[in-house]
Amino acid sequence: MAGSTSTDSLPPLAVVGLSFKFPEDATSSDAFWQMLLEGRCVSTEFPADRMNIDAHYHPDRNRLDSVSMRGGHFLKENLAAFDAPFFSMSAAEAEAMDPQQRMVLETVYRALENAGLPMEKVARSKTSVIAGSFSDDYFLLQTKDPLDMPKYTAVGTSRNMLANRVSWFFDLLGPSVAVDTACSSSLIALDMTCQSIWSGDAAMGVTIGSNVILTPELTMSLDNLGLLSRDSLSYSFDSRANGYARGEGIGVIVIKRLDSAIRDGDTVRAVIRSSSSNQDGKTPGITQPSKDAQVRLIRDTYKKAGLDMSLTRYFEAHGTGTPIGDPIEARAIGMAFRRYMSPEKPLYV
């Protein structure tokens, strides 16, 4: 995005490294891009090695002891495979560790490698680690029978360890925080990473987003609220919208100031000009977003960056896939950009 309207804007940040594990074969940037080009859907039934979906499925959404969908978007790899000695831990520690933690460690390593940063170069650096996550299914599995609870459950399943274990293993000295804000967890983690660099608390930041589905409890509770799609598909901004489809993934990006990235000869994969967050306040229901809050956030973020809103031609939306959330978000985007759009200059969402 170009075009600045202020000389007082925040110093731009650069994404210098990335790595991720997404559903099915989308485990690299090239594979993910190819999936997008093909418009390929990777929704499948719940894997048999995770849970017996037949034992939990019932088509009647009014039943509170079941789920009304049969699938979602799942990682294809073996979640039990992990090189524990490489990450300085025993087999007993690894066994008690949430697969999210295991894959986060692996993905951070690859993201730093992607950025051209060897471990010895980042060790003892002022690097923040902010992890966003929304689930702790492995904790539920580990604590179902207290008599069989592994010794290392406390550190293996605590959500804070998604960030803290990365900081420990790579010897990073910046802020280390795990955050849960439901669907926005990963983006809030990104916002907090940016703020840590802009505030001077960190010279570089690692942003993490993770989700793994291992038990039916969270899926069941979300389905009870009518938030999940019976079709296991998200029909965002579509008349067929009936909820969202749950999915798995681990994503990591490495961020530093743009001027530092240019000075160090880093590959700049994207530039972040501004980042902000807010809350809806008291809406008609606690899960219902606020159009006015979203409009304010969009405008405030552009203003803080000194960016000209008329130059934006593409906007990536949340796209809840719900009959309530989608219209609110569409109206908010429309209100924020209305004066800058025309048939000749549309805004693609």
Residue ranges and their predicted role:
Residues 2-349:
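Condensing-enzyme catalytic core of the thiolase-fold
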